[in-house]
């Protein structure tokens, strides 16, 4: 059978690039990205990478903080694996030339962020970590892989229960292994820190092909998104800023708790706004803010540069769930792996701990690459490729703006049975188009279908989970319930199931 490469990677964020870096010597790797190679949330990432690298810190403490932030919903085995590998990942990036900030003594300059028990965040130029890491990884792989940029994957090519390639707007490509690393879905909300490419493509592609997805009701809203500059709309003000002394203050002069977990701080700001107050981040207590956080300072408007008290609001930031995978990044479909934000590894539980996202991408790329190297099997001749389902008679989808506004209002920081029921009904006329498995007449329609499909599943999951936990808050069920602890809501082939994640032990400091 025709084979265009050995490993296809869909996406170009940190998980995609680390996968390519680890596989490039053993296989012909083809990386496909729908935009520029640096157009990813990884490139936008500010705060840094969490690693228990300081004297007195250890992986057990990092594990406990991760578990607690995740509202006791995380996969304990995966969390431990991630935290145990964290220091090795930092050392690897060091070897690749990433210039992490250091103290005069030569040790790492470690930041403190919300819900961490100690300083353990390595960073570059205060809040430019993503750019530095991505540039170093790209430099290491660019001459050893095939890049297809500005190429959109519209469909996974399926043979029975395995994925054997991808269909793009430039044609079909076949390979024995496909890794999906397309990131999250923040663009389905009207306020988000995510780049315009974050439209949930990978999850929708996998789901339409029959892969299981889980925990999608757990959306993390970052409490400090800056919208005061049209050119920098959705600029994230890193948690590192609050770790260095930035204080959240309301227009009424009330000081909020700045270093609680993200879900707690976001809900508090949301409630203040509902009561008619604005919330500002007072940066005047940080000496030499412009030097420590130059990119953030540059992103402020003139007034906020002068006062150093920018207004902030919560925005969609991270999807804690995604494509269901095991500890090796394997999905429920053979030959298909998922790594990074697109995957549900269980390490974040119901609410991600700050600066664990880049770490997850690095560690699980390593896991997937290791498994691929150990189990690689070439494609065999005579495979049967499933034909496309019939194209819908007409393509009917909501506008992006309408979807964003409704998701923010009804399936956002606070949810209620009434709002979820309303949204579930609102989605019904669009679902035939949203479930269609390509080919698509244009990219904008494809992205809108992906967001609509995923938004509908998020809404239905949020309705099923009649409790509050982490990034999922039900105003009509404001407390967590024991019967929902470690209960996973999983979707596959149009139906949902509830499964219990095995609990090994309760993690605590």
Swiss-Prot record:
First-listed, main subcellular location of the protein, grouped into a coarse class: cytoplasm
Enzyme Commission number(s) of this protein: 1.4.3.16
Pathway: Cofactor biosynthesis; NAD(+) biosynthesis; iminoaspartate from L-aspartate (oxidase route): step 1/1
Location(s), subcellular: Cytoplasm
A GO molecular function held by the record: nucleotide binding
Pfam (any one): Succ_DH_flav_C
Active-site annotation: 262
Keywords: Cytoplasm, FAD, Flavoprotein, Nucleotide-binding, Oxidoreductase, Pyridine nucleotide biosynthesis
Single GO cellular component term: cytoplasm
Cofactor names: FAD
Site feature location: Important in orienting the L-aspartate substrate: 113
GO biological process: 'de novo' NAD biosynthetic process from L-aspartate
Similarity comment text for this entry: Belongs to the FAD-dependent oxidoreductase 2 family. NadB subfamily.
Function of the protein: Catalyzes the oxidation of L-aspartate to iminoaspartate, the first step in the de novo biosynthesis of NAD(+).
Name this protein carries in UniProt: L-aspartate oxidase
Species, as recorded: Halalkalibacterium halodurans (strain ATCC BAA-125 / DSM 18197 / FERM 7344 / JCM 9153 / C-125)
Annotated gene: nadB
